[in-house]
Amino acid sequence: MAGVSCTIETDKLPPNLRGICQRRESRAADSEDLNVTKRNIGVLGAGTWGMALARMLCVSGNDVQVWSAIEKEIDSLSSTRVHPNLPGMKIPDELRFTKSIEEACKDKDVLLFAVPSVFVRSTAAKARPYVADDQIIVDVAKGIEPDTLYTMTEILADELGKEGG
């Protein structure tokens, strides 16, 4: 995926993010020159955090596919290529969307869980049949499950039968 191009309309971003995004863009362009392993990544969750991470992973040259439990959200993101809470961030054409959690999980090197903490367990349960033993699992949600006092990593280990680190 060398040569992935995308733009951020930095004038539409909050002032504190403008410089960060410009630096990130220049680093992403430089990543083609590095000896970096490109990954096939499934992102579970299309909220603000999930989409920001998906975009960053995509412009870094990875093959990224995003899933959401909200089908209308996938339709909107696919057609507009803009997240409603991130109006200055254009979604690269190379970033793909799916309504199928199976498609988002299968044949991926990495699964990135980017759903709110209250949905980590239910999302992991939906993903469980499609998670391979050799997949890298990453969770970016924070919090503690009230009933069990488990962290999000412990919930994923419980649901997926994989120990995290």
Task: Write out the residue ranges for each language-model feature.
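Intrinsic-disorder-associated, low-complexity terminal segments enriched in Asp/Asn/His/Tyr and depleted
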Residues: 11, 16, 30-33
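NAD(P)+-binding Rossmann beta1-loop-alpha1 motif at the extreme N-terminus of oxidoreductases
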Residues: 19, 33-90, 96-99, 126
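Rossmann-like NAD(P)(H) cofactor-binding subdomain of soluble oxidoreductases
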Residues: 101, 110-165
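A short, aliphatic-rich alpha-helical micro-motif
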Residues: 104-106
